Amino acid sequence: MNRLRKGDEVIVIAGKDKGKRGSVSQVMQNGKLIVDGINLAKKHVKPNPMTGEQGGIVSKEMPVDASNVALYNPETKKADRVGVRVEGDVKTRFFKSNGKSVDA
């Protein structure tokens, strides 16, 4: 079970965007995440007359390693570690600081 999922609110704990918050928009298989508004890079795009795309410089979100982000706990308003608790056949994620469920 992945500790971070699409739609989770995360906070960056290392790197150039340290301290910024965002929502996970994509989880990749190689342990990287794409977070809205984090790790923006400028990409030069060629115009494509076939599709009608205009050329120019575009800001694009680049992947961030999962080890550089932590789940944001809205109760404590801080980054928090995540654990997995097995209740019967169901796995649920919980915050390590207060034991409350993430998915509730």
Swiss-Prot record:
Belongs to the universal ribosomal protein uL24 family. One of its GO terms (biological process) is translation. It comes from the Bacteria. Part of the 50S ribosomal subunit. One of its GO terms (cellular component) is ribosome. It comes from Hydrogenovibrio crunogenus (strain DSM 25203 / XCL-2) (Thiomicrospira crunogena). Gene3D superfamilies: 2.30.30.30. One of two assembly initiator proteins, it binds directly to the 5'-end of the 23S rRNA, where it nucleates assembly of the 50S subunit. One of the proteins that surrounds the polypeptide exit tunnel on the outside of the subunit. HAMAP family: Ribosomal_uL24_B (MF_01326_B). PROSITE patterns: RIBOSOMAL_L24. Keywords: Ribonucleoprotein, Ribosomal protein, RNA-binding, rRNA-binding. This is Large ribosomal subunit protein uL24. PANTHER family: MITOCHONDRIAL RIBOSOMAL PROTEIN L24 (PTHR12903). CDD domains: KOW_RPL26. One of its GO terms (molecular function) is structural constituent of ribosome.
